[in-house]
Structure formats: structure tokens, C-alpha cells
From Swiss-Prot:
Organism name: Schizosaccharomyces pombe (strain 972 / ATCC 24843) (Fission yeast)
GO BP terms, alphabetized: mitochondrial tRNA wobble position uridine thiolation; tRNA wobble position uridine thiolation
Interaction with tRNA: annotated span: 183-185, 356-357
Disulfide bonding pattern of the chain: 129-234
UniProt miscellaneous comment: During the reaction, ATP is used to activate the C2 atom of U34 by adenylation. After this, the persulfide sulfur on the catalytic cysteine is transferred to the C2 atom of the wobble base (U34) of mitochondrial tRNA(Lys), tRNA(Glu) and tRNA(Gln). The reaction probably involves hydrogen sulfide that is generated from the persulfide intermediate and that acts as a nucleophile towards the activated C2 atom on U34. Subsequently, a transient disulfide bond is formed between the two active site cysteine residues.
Localization terms from the record: Mitochondrion
Lineage: Eukaryota, Fungi, Dikarya, Ascomycota, Taphrinomycotina
Protein name per UniProt: Mitochondrial tRNA-specific 2-thiouridylase 1
Length: 415
């Protein structure tokens, strides 16, 4: 598709703006107030330590997002984490405060995720939690607090592995990939509001996870550095095991009808209705036992499509079956992160795309069909792109934003 001269110029200018020499690190001045979002983990604790050691006026903030501890999956016991945060803040000689966002988390993250599960999709609760709660409700609460209680500028610091920079000419904020590419968490942050990004810093932007743990131990936080990383509800997917699936069963509706399992045009088996079609994800192995002695059923079978209306699950043989592959997908609910490019409708932009966490960036052509709908055509085939997941788009190492996978065009369809 032909690109207008105006857009060509804009892309060139945009690309120039994202060059390292055109940006500076977004960072507070010595007199600024810095609130550190703390979870009790090593990343946020070490972030607070770094800022305190650099002489900043630091205050820890802790969020409780889940009300009923007994009903939560084994992930992040809030009271124990709050006690750890208080202990760290006392050691650093900084104050800390606690915010309760159970209502916001339930209404803005958990219930929408349940709706997606019930419609056969696989959501990213961690992405919506960052946008709606950490860089939404928490940011708004801090902003309101600072209007009357803080003189001068203030910042929100997060222990995420990401980097916030400012364009020297336009003074606009951008989010970039950090030094530790393996721990890069920009995918989880790709939809946060521009207003929040402009006030956010990431102290670990030039640190590796290995060095964070090493230095945290040396700084007196050995117990925190050595404990197993916990994952709260935001960061859990159905793939992690039966415990989370059992937890979701308390909230999701089930069909009385059995789930039909279809290979090609043939029904090859059934799951009981209480299994929950929502618990099966595109790309994972099908748990149905097929007669391996018969050649037509021999091998490993994987989910490639879910049909909620007809309560059917489609499977294919082989982990790299063409039915699992796609080069063209469509996103909805697109959100910009920082710079918003103008007049992009129906014009293809060469970008990089991240489909899932820790995956290398994938070259692709990205077309904005309208302000909220995006078409992505990958250079290489992608396996098991899953409706409901969030995908992030990049120019150079700058994250432009992200959107939810709406539809996927497989490379091959059954005759």
C-alpha cells in the first residue's frame, strides 16, 4: 500500500526522534519527591534503596488489590508483603503508606478478565492491572495527595524493567526497552496512560536482574533477594496449573453440554462441561487421550481454535502445524504509550512487534485501520497468536503502544 508523502516525512521524523542522541533519561531533580511502588519483592525494594542512596526524598507506597486472602490463588499474600515493605522502609529510614484498591481491581481488571475468559479469550490481566490500577488508581491518588501536600515536582518510581526517556526537542515522554532485554517488561506496560508515563521513572532501566539480586544482598536485603519471585493474580495465566483453574471455577459459568473435540471435520472425543472451554488456550496440548495405535490419531495434538457458541474445541497434530501459524492478525482497543502518530489510517508502517513476554521483537508491517483498530502483517510466521492477548508495537527500542488480539488469520484452513 502506498504511503503518503506526509506520513513518510512523519515516520522519518518519528524515527529520528527515537534515536538515543535525541532523547535524555527521564529522571527527577534532586529536590523532587519520589514515591516508590513497593510489593515486598527485590526489584521494588532495590529501586527504593537506589533512590534513597542517591539522596532523593523517597516514600514507599503499597497497594492491596485483593480483598479475600483465602480465595486468592497462591501468589502474593498481601499482609505478609505489606509487613516486608514496612520492614524495608524502616531499614531505609523512609516513610511508607498503604492504598486499598480492591474495588478498582475487581471492577477494572478482574471482572473484565472473567468476561474475556467466558467468551473463549485468554486475557492479559497484568497489562490491564498496570493501566487501570498501578498507573491508574494509584497514580491518581498520588496526584491528588501531592496537590495539597507536596511542594514542587513529584514522581512515581516502579521496579519494572523498562526505561522512560524525554525527547529533547518536543519534551514528550517515551517508554523504551531496558538494558536487560531478557527481563524487558515493556509489553506489560504498553498501554499505560500518557499522563502517568510523563511522571514515571524506572530505576532498574540499566540494571540486569542478576546484578540487582547481587547488589541487593550486599546492601542488606539478602533474604528478599533470595526468596522465590512471587506472582500476584495479575501475572497468572491458565497455563500455570490446576490451582489457578480451580480458583477461576468459582467465578465462571459452565455449560451443561460436553465440549466437542474436533480434528479436521471429525468429532474425536469430548470433555465434560465442567472442564471449562475457557481453561484451554490456543497453542497448548490437548489433554484428550487419543488412540495412538491408530495412524490417524498418532502424535501430539494441540488446540488451534475454540468455538464458544457451539462448545467445540478444534485440535491439530504437531506443535508447528500450519493451523497454529499466522502472518496476519488484527488488534482492537489500541492504546498509545507516549507519542501518538497522526494520520496513520490505511498506511503501513514498518515496526517491530512483541507477541509474548521474552519473545524477540518480530519485524512486521503495521496498519492503523482506525484509531483503535490495527492490522499487523508479520515478516515471519508466528505460532499460536491468541485472541485476548495484548501485543506491543515498537519503533527502534521505543514502545508505541499496544492492543488486544481480536482475530487471527491462519496460514491454512481445512477444506
Amino acid at each position: 500500500m502506498r504511503v503518503s508523502l506526509f506520513l513518510q516525512k512523519q515516520i522519518i521524523e518519528c524515527s529520528k526522534a527515537f534515536q538515543p542522541h535525541s532523547t535524555r533519561l527521564q529522571w527527577p531533580k534532586s529536590q523532587d519527591k519520589v514515591f516508590v511502588a513497593m510489593s515486598g519483592g527485590v526489584d521494588s525494594s532495590f529501586s527504593a534503596y537506589l533512590l534513597k542512596s542517591q539522596g532523593y526524598n523517597v516514600e514507599g507506597v503499597f497497594m492491596r488489590n485483593w480483598l479475600d486472602e483465602d480465595s486468592a490463588p497462591s501468589g502474593c499474600p498481601a499482609e505478609r508483603d505489606w509487613a516486608t515493605v514496612q520492614k524495608v522502609c524502616k531499614k531505609l529510614n523512609i516513610s511508607c503508606r498503604r492504598f486499598n484498591f480492591e474495588k478498582e481491581y475487581w471492577n477494572l481488571v478482574f471482572e473484565p478478565s472473567l468476561d474475556l475468559y467466558e467468551n473463549g479469550l485468554t486475557p492479559n490481566p497484568d497489562v490491564s492491572c498496570n493501566r487501570q490500577v498501578k498507573f491508574g488508581a494509584l497514580f491518581d491518588a498520588l496526584k491528588k495527595h501531592c496537590e495539597n501536600n507536596v511542594k514542587g515536582d513529584w514522581w512515581l518510581a516502579s521496579g519494572h524493567y523498562a526505561k522512560s526517556v524525554v525527547n529533547i526537542e518536543t519534551n514528550e515522554s517515551h517508554m523504551c526497552i531496558p538494558t536487560d532485554k531478557r527481563k524487558d517488561q515493556t509489553l506489560f506496560l504498553c498501554t499505560i496512560r500518557k499522563e502517568a508515563l510523563e511522571k514515571t521513572i524506572f530505576p532498574l532501566h540499566n540494571w540486569t536482574k542478576e546484578n540487582v539480586k547481587k547488589q541487593a544482598s550486599s546492601a542488606g536485603f539478602k533474604e528478599i533477594a533470595e526468596k522465590q519471585e512471587s506472582q500476584g493474580l495479575c501475572f497468572v495465566s491458565p497455563n500455570v496449573g490446576r490451582k489457578f483453574r480451580k480458583f477461576l471455577q468459582r467465578y465462571l459459568n459452565f455449560s451443561d453440554r460436553p465440549i466437542k473435540v474436533i480434528a479436521g471435520k471429525n468429532v474425536v472425543g469430548e470433555f465434560s462441561g465442567n472442564h471449562g472451554i475457557w481453561s484451554l488456550t490456543v497453542g497448548e496440548r490437548c489433554g484428550l487421550s487419543l488412540p495412538q495405535a491408530q495412524s490417524e490419531y498418532f502424535g501430539r495434538w494441540y488446540v488451534w481454535k475454540k468455538d464458544i457458541k457451539n462448545n467445540a474445541l478444534y485440535i491439530c497434530r504437531g506443535t508447528n502445524n500450519e493451523l497454529l501459524m499466522s502472518k496476519c492478525i488484527y488488534l482492537k482497543d489500541w492504546k498509545w504509550c507516549g507519542t501518538k502518530l497522526q494520520n496513520l489510517e490505511k498506511s503501513a508502517l514498518s515496526c517491530f512487534v512483541r507477541v509474548r513476554h521474552q519473545q524477540p521483537l518480530q519485524p512486521a508491517k503495521v496498519t492503523w485501520r482506525n484509531p483503535e483498530s490495527v492490522k499487523i502483517h508479520f515478516q515471519d510466521k508466528q505460532r499460536a497468536v491468541t485472541p485476548g492477548q495484548v501485543i506491543a508495537v515498537y519503533v527502534n527500542d521505543v514502545c508505541l503502544g499496544g492492543g488486544m488480539v481480536d482475530t487471527v488469520e491462519p496460514e491454512k484452513d481445512f477444506d
